[in-house]
């Protein structure tokens, strides 16, 4: 199974949840019904648990993210960057099989691919603070 590819799909689905207001289960089931996407290499359990975990802990994740922002409000962060922050913060807090530093590095890679270069240092800074506060 390819965790990097699975994390990319998790980002896309977390973003979809954010813009459509679908539940995690609706979003995941819609993804599973899409026959155009090969799921052979994906860690579907990781994707599903990530979506459900983000939905279940959204207030806690957002509160933790917002507490690390300097001169920013959560509603100013792009939906893509917010989705990246939520995924990584969720992993730092709850995913025992993903070391925090690995999650931060993967978030930076997602940011480079799906956002802009200016956001990389922002994402890195916020997640580094989240990680250090969890130690």
Swiss-Prot record:
<dbReference type="GO" id="GO:0003723">
    <property type="term" value="F:RNA binding"/>
</dbReference>
<comment type="function">
    <text>Involved in transcription antitermination. Required for transcription of ribosomal RNA (rRNA) genes. Binds specifically to the boxA antiterminator sequence of the ribosomal RNA (rrn) operons.</text>
</comment>
<dbReference type="InterPro" id="IPR035926">
    <property type="entry name" value="NusB-like_sf"/>
</dbReference>
<dbReference type="InterPro" id="IPR006027">
    <property type="entry name" value="NusB_RsmB_TIM44"/>
</dbReference>
<dbReference type="GO" id="GO:0006353">
    <property type="term" value="P:DNA-templated transcription termination"/>
</dbReference>
<keyword id="KW-0694">RNA-binding</keyword>
<dbReference type="Pfam" id="PF01029">
    <property type="entry name" value="NusB"/>
</dbReference>
<protein>
    <recommendedName>
        <fullName>Transcription antitermination protein NusB</fullName>
    </recommendedName>
</protein>
<dbReference type="GO" id="GO:0031564">
    <property type="term" value="P:transcription antitermination"/>
</dbReference>
<keyword id="KW-0805">Transcription regulation</keyword>
<dbReference type="InterPro" id="IPR011605">
    <property type="entry name" value="NusB_fam"/>
</dbReference>
<keyword id="KW-0889">Transcription antitermination</keyword>
<dbReference type="GO" id="GO:0005829">
    <property type="term" value="C:cytosol"/>
</dbReference>
<keyword id="KW-0804">Transcription</keyword>
<comment type="similarity">
    <text>Belongs to the NusB family.</text>
</comment>
């Amino acid at each position: 199974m390819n965790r990097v590819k699975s994390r990319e799909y998790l980002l896309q689905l977390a973003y979809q949840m954010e813009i459509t207001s679908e539940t995690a289960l609706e979003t995941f089931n819609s993804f599973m019904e899409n026959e155009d996407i090969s799921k052979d290499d994906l860690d579907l359990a990781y994707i599903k648990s990530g979506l459900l975990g983000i939905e279940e802990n959204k207030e806690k994740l957002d509160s933790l993210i917002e507490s690390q922002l300097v001169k920013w409000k959560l509603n100013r962060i792009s939906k893509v960057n917010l989705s990246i922050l939520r995924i990584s913060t969720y992993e730092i807090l709850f995913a025992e099989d993903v070391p925090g530093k690995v999650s931060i590095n993967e978030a930076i890679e997602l940011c480079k691919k799906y956002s802009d270069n200016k956001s990389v240092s922002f994402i890195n800074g916020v997640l580094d603070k989240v990680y250090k506060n969890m130690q």
